[in-house]
Structure formats: structure tokens, C-alpha cells
């Protein structure tokens, strides 16, 4: 159960990081424009 939870947390953090990066990229794009 602990290992499964760890994997889920890793997946969640990974997706969150990518989504945050995407948002930051969009914001930077807007600032440049």
C-alpha cells in the first residue's frame, strides 16, 4: 500500500509540475506578446 501511494504521489506531482509549467509558458507567451 505504501509503495502504491508513493507511485500515485509521484504521478500526481509529475502531472501537476507539467501543468504548472504549461501555465507558466502560456503566461510568458502573453507577456511577450
From Swiss-Prot:
Report the subcellular localization: Cytoplasm
**Can you tell which superkingdom this protein's organism belongs to?**
Eukaryota
Provide the alphabetized UniProt keywords: Cytoplasm, Ribonucleoprotein, Ribosomal protein
**Gene3D superfamilies on file:** 3.30.390.110
| GO cellular component terms attached to this protein's record | cytoplasm; ribonucleoprotein complex; ribosome
Main function: Component of the large ribosomal subunit. The ribosome is a large ribonucleoprotein complex responsible for the synthesis of proteins in the cell.
This protein's assembly is summarised as: Component of the large ribosomal subunit.
* Family classification: Belongs to the eukaryotic ribosomal protein eL28 family.
This one is known as Large ribosomal subunit protein eL28
Tell me what organism the protein belongs to.
Answer: Xenopus laevis
What's the name of its gene? rpl28
Amino acid at each position: 500500500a505504501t509503495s502504491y501511494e508513493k507511485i500515485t504521489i509521484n504521478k500526481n506531482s509529475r502531472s501537476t509540475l507539467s501543468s504548472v509549467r504549461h501555465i507558466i509558458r502560456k503566461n510568458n507567451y502573453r507577456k511577450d506578446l
